[in-house]
Amino acid sequence: MLVATLLCALCCGLLAASAHAGYSEDRCSWRGSGLTQEPGSVGQLTLDCTEGAIEWLYPAGALRLTLGGPDPGTRPSIVCLRPERPFAGAQVFAERMTGNLELLLAEGPDLAGGRCMRWGPRERRALFLQATPHRDISRRVAAFRFELHEDQRAEMSPQAQGLGVDGACRPCSDAELLLAACTSDFVIHGTIHGVAHDTELQESVITVVVARVIRQTLPLFKEGSSEGQGRASIRTLLRCGVRPGPGSFLFMGWSRFGEAWLGCAPRFQEFSRVYSAALTTHLNPCEMALD
């Protein structure tokens, strides 16, 4: 009995050491192999950063990944995952306070370019990675990048977060347009030059001719100059069916993994009407210069 107990403790110690050895120096990323994991076991991982990467080679068993430290915080948070291709050998779920698991990433040819979801206040920010069974032993890698954001815009509709959340294709209401103009990572006035579709990533890339950068929190866009027109790329979901259209638009959205993702895109004239009406009734969330 004593020998069995010692062997069990030794195995647990080796698994913990193996998982620990897979951490990057800043403990923002982890790389490990299922070949060192006991069948049916659940490895425990904690990444203290708000962005990083996971690379799980030859997935086996399961991993439970806690993001951003052990304290869930008092504000809602948003996690976005972007899989590396080919993503194979595992599924990724988000743990919910109810005990349910919400599927975020799964292997297969229809895997979209990424997914975001929201955790509520005090909800533990944990992901559950489960290996999928395969009969052969060919090399499989389940790898993805993650970003964790504090959700300061809980009143925004789901499509404001971009990158594959439910409802991402419906138009924004007038109230959502006004709030997006005040809280988005970027607000630019421009026209659509073209739209390219990526069926593999299930994304559409909108090429925008930038007339004016009204606001941005990151240096994603540059205005046109005397040397030529400034152009920018904004991503959205392929299933939204974006097509080139005439006229000027106000593009608003978020930065995800260093890329611009579309939230709301009303015609500039339409937004001007909504904003003017809000100014008249003193219901505008913020002031902005449209001229």
UniProtKB/Swiss-Prot annotation:
Tissues showing expression: Highly expressed in brain. Expressed in undifferentiated neural progenitors and in astrocyte lineage, particularly in Bergmann glia, a subtype of radial glia, and a few discrete neuronal populations residing in the superior colliculus, the ocular motor nucleus, the raphe and pontine nuclei, and in various thalamic nuclei. Weakly expressed in heart, kidney, skeletal muscle, spleen, testis, gut and lung.
Induction entry: By all-trans retinoic acid (ATRA).
Keyword entries, A-Z: Developmental protein, Differentiation, Disulfide bond, Neurogenesis, Secreted, Signal
One of the GO BP terms on file: radial glial cell differentiation
Keyword Nucleotide-binding listed: no
Bridged cysteine pairs (disulfide): 28-49, 80-116, 169-240, 172-264, 182-286
GO cellular component: extracellular space
Keyword Lipid metabolism: no
Signal peptide as annotated in the record: 1-21
Predominant subcellular localization, coarse grouping: secreted
Entries under InterPro entries matching the protein: Meteorin-like
Compartmental location: Secreted
Function text: Involved in both glial cell differentiation and axonal network formation during neurogenesis. Promotes astrocyte differentiation and transforms cerebellar astrocytes into radial glia. Also induces axonal extension in small and intermediate neurons of sensory ganglia by activating nearby satellite glia.
Subunit structure: Monomer.
Comment field (misc): Was called meteorin because it can transform glial cells into cells with an elongated trail.
Family, as annotated: Belongs to the meteorin family.
Name the UniProt record assigns to this protein: Meteorin
Organism of origin: Mus musculus
